[in-house]
Every structure is written in C-alpha cells, then in structure tokens.
C-alpha cells in the first residue's frame, strides 16, 4: 500500500510539473540587428549577449520563456525599419537590438508607431531620447562615454588633442561634447570631421602630424573607421603619446583580428578581458556565454545581455499582471531599478539610463586592461 501511495504521489508530481510546463507562457521577442554590412562585427557581438540572456532567463524564470526571432538589418536604416515591421507581423511583444544611432532612430520610430517597446545599447545620439518616443529605452548614453574619454586624457596630463570623428549624428554629438569639455579644461583641441564613406585616412593623419602636432588622437567613429585611422597612423607615425577611441574598440575580437594595430590603443570597456565574475549574476552570464559560444564574453555581449534581460524581466512582470497587450511592458520598463553587470540601471521619463558610466581599457598583449578610473583599474 505504501509503495502504491508513493507511486501515485510521484505520478501526481510529474503530472503537475508537466501541466505547469504545458501552460508556461512563451513570448516572442524580436531582434533587429546588423549581422552583415559595416556594423556586422558589433551586431554579432551584441546578439551573442542577447542569446545568453535568453539562455539565463529561460533557465531561471520558471514560469515564462522567451523565443527570439532575429532579422538582419544589414547595417541599413531602411532595412532596419523593414526588420521592425517584419518582426511586428510575427507577433513579437517587444524588440531588442539595433546598432548605430542612424539605424536605431528610424527603427525605434517604426516600433513606437506599432506600440512595441524597443531597448538598445547601440545608439548614444541624444536625439534618440529627445524625440518623444514613449517606448524607447537605452542602457547607455553619450555622457558616460564622454566622461570616460576626457577623464583618461586629463589624467594622462595631455596638453593637446586631435579629435577625428565621423559626421554621423551620434559621433558628431559626442565629438562636439568632448571638444567643449577638453577646451574648458585648458586642453588644445583640433577637430577633423570625415565622411563615413572614407577609407583612406592618411591625409587626415598627415595633418595631425604636420599641422596639429598634437600629443594625443581621440577617434570617434566605428570599427572600420578605427582600423583605417590606426593603419594610417602606423604608416605615417605621428609623434603622439597615445590614441583612443570609444565603442567597439577595446574588445578581444579586435585584438584577434588586428593584432598589429591594437597594442597600447585605448578604448571604452565595462570590464577587463579576461574577467573573473564573482557575483551569482556574473557567474550565470559567464556560464551561459561559455555554454553557447565556448569563449570569454566582451563588453558588446555584456550590453546585449543586460538590455535584453531587463526587457525579459519586464515582459514577465507584465505577463503576471495581464498587461502585455495594454502597454504593460513599457510600464514595467519604466519601473526598472536593477543592479546589473554594467551597474545600476534605471530609466528616466525619456527612456535614458541616468546612472550610466564607462571605463577605459587598453590593449596590452591579448588582454584588455582597465586603466581608468583609478578605482576600477586592474593595471597600468
């Protein structure tokens, strides 16, 4: 009799678990991201983090699961809009991804018209949060990057800087902010704007070498721009103390792909590479990354992970309240107050994260070593 009762109890437990699994809510989330074109490298890095977020969320939530539907926007604004519209037709409840403010802006407008939340870490142009989009959220911004780059240059005691920047919206805004801040600190600044289509940077570097004679070069652009500038600098050898860039530069991928160009180059980095995670949340991220990709994560993956996990948690809360189709995801995003791998994240009424700050890393061998600010540095 006891054996029969135990068997029945076990069967009930299994059946109950199966019923819960059968009734678990699965939500489709759209990923609009560049997987081809000029921004493919950064897009793929961000997407890796997004997929790790799904792995961790589905493993730990217990009640809801997320399914991704991904569309390559081919690094094109028009294709980004088309991607959002296609994903909306496939009944996604929200969107994560995007890279490049000029791509994200039109895509976010499309999402806003469709009533879909759009979260990103790929666009820092302040126009993204100053244009009345009620469903747009981002975890990083220009102010955090500007503070880090200017902080490094100031602490290095640099007296003169040449700022080389792309004429795209986000890069122009950041470059102008950097210029104004450094001039206010008494640093001599010369700026050189370039068209995004340019590939030969030797004329610009020649001006830096012969006319500016600056001690330092600050690059504000994207991966392909950095590679072109660094190649030109390697050929012409201007007498500079250092060269730094912002996003998409201080990554192990760049070190692996361009080992001749990266030594001693500075770039923004949330964490050093490799990194030892000590918190449960950090370990869950690292373990998920190792499982899916069998490699160490970089900051692009960290950003993609953080933005997406916050979104998935907001979706889950809205689902619990039955408000998914009533604007609940946006409402829950606005209530976000979470300690994450990039620090505390909250969203102000415009969808911006006022707590965001960056750090500066330097390529040293196969490592990315944090060198600014001093309290976060793990090397010199």
Describe these PLM feature segments:
Residues 291-301, 312-368:
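Segments of small-molecule ligand-sensing domains
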Residues 26, 42-46, 56-130, 195-201, ...:
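Beta-alpha junction/loop-to-helix N-cap segments that form part of ligand/metal-binding clefts
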């Amino acid at each position: 009799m006891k054996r029969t009762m135990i068997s029945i109890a076990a069967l009930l437990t299994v059946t109950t678990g199966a019923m819960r699994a059968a009734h678990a809510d699965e939500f489709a989330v759209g990923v609009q991201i560049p997987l081809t074109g000029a921004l493919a490298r950064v897009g793929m890095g961000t997407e890796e983090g997004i997929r790790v977020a799904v792995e961790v969320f589905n493993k730990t939530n217990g009640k809801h699961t997320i399914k991704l539907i991904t569309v390559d926007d081919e690094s094109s604004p028009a294709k980004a809009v088309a991607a959002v519209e296609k994903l909306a037709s496939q009944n996604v409840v929200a969107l994560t991804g995007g890279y490049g403010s000029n791509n994200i802006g039109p895509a976010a407008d499309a999402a806003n018209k469709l009533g879909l939340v759009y979260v990103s870490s790929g666009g820092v142009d302040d126009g993204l949060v100053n244009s009345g989009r009620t469903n747009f959220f981002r975890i990083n911004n220009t102010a955090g990057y500007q503070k880090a780059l200017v902080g490094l240059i100031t602490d290095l005691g640099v007296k003169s800087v040449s700022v080389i920047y792309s004429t795209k919206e986000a890069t122009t805004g950041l470059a102008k902010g950097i210029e104004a801040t450094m001039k206010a600190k008494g640093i001599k600044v010369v700026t050189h704007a370039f068209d995004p289509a340019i590939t030969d940077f030797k004329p610009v570097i020649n001006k830096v070498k012969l006319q500016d004679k600056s001690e330092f070069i600050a690059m504000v652009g994207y991966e392909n721009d950095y590679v072109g500038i660094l190649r030109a600098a390697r050929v012409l050898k201007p007498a500079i103390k250092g060269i730094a860039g912002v996003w998409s530069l201080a990554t192990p991928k760049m070190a692996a792909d361009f080992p001749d160009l990266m030594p001693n180059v500075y770039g923004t980095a949330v964490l050093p590479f490799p990194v030892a995670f000590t918190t449960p949340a950090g370990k869950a991220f690292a373990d998920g990354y190792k499982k899916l990709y069998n490699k160490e994560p970089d900051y692009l993956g960290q950003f993609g992970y953080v933005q997406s996990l916050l979104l998935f948690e907001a979706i889950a809360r809205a689902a619990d309240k039955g408000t998914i189709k009533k604007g609940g995801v946006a409402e829950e995003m606005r209530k976000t107050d979470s300690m994450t791998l990039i620090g505390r994240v909250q969203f102000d009424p415009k969808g911006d994260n006022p707590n965001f700050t960056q750090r500066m890393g330097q390529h040293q061998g196969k490592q990315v070593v944090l060198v600014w600010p001093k309290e976060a540095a793990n090397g010199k």
